[in-house]
């Protein structure tokens, strides 16, 4: 009978010592991994706190909102239309396209551009509609713009090519404005003054032209008839000026004597 071989104790001791040697290394690696996770969590928490702080602070909101280019339209109307409130509106909620669309819907504004500078400073530059007429009597001075907008305003020296409107109430001025915007600029520039002539003809108008002629016509026929004015005067006797009445037909009566 064979004798039982003794266990190889030295080899087992070496294995145990090897595992004991590796345990500190494994522990160190686990500790480093846990530290990295903790750092990532702390960074994430810090970022979240920073975002919350930023959103709650004034740094995330519109710092200034300036409007340039206004002449007749009030800046307050433009700012209100933009829906931007300084120190209240968050900058990331500001859509340039939407803001400009709302501003260009303001009566009297033809177009607008917007630029943004550092730290949420905004500036909007507007181009107003051209002034095409000026009403100088009661209930107060008013300016008529090319889009038909009627706004309070004082006489301006630069209105050289715009007619003066006299004797119009708010209602009659609105009716005239709807027709006035349909007049070609080259014809409109020939009108010196338009007077409400309601005393003789309801809705009637008396126009004093820059060439010396006077035109009588109704508001309803204003735009259609007056756009033919150049053709009408070309058919008049050369060198003659007078009163042109447009009422179904066209009638010319020269002034008596020299005007």
Curated annotation (Swiss-Prot):
The chain crosses the membrane at residues 39-59. This is Cell division protein DivIB. PANTHER family: CELL DIVISION PROTEIN DIVIB, CELL DIVISION PROTEIN FTSQ. InterPro entries: Cell_div_FtsQ/DivIB_C, DivIB, FtsQ_DivIB, POTRA, POTRA_FtsQ_type. It comes from Exiguobacterium sibiricum (strain DSM 17290 / CCUG 55495 / CIP 109462 / JCM 13490 / 255-15). Keywords: Cell cycle, Cell division, Cell membrane, Membrane, Transmembrane, Transmembrane helix. The keyword Cell division applies. One of its GO terms (cellular component) is plasma membrane. Disulfide bonds: none annotated. It is a single-pass type II membrane protein. Cell division protein that may be involved in stabilizing or promoting the assembly of the division complex. It is found in: Cell membrane. Residues 1-38 are cytoplasmic. Residues 60-129 form the POTRA domain. Belongs to the FtsQ/DivIB family. DivIB subfamily. GO terms for biological process: FtsZ-dependent cytokinesis. Residues 60-259 are extracellular. Its main location: membrane. Pfam families: FtsQ_DivIB_C, POTRA_1.
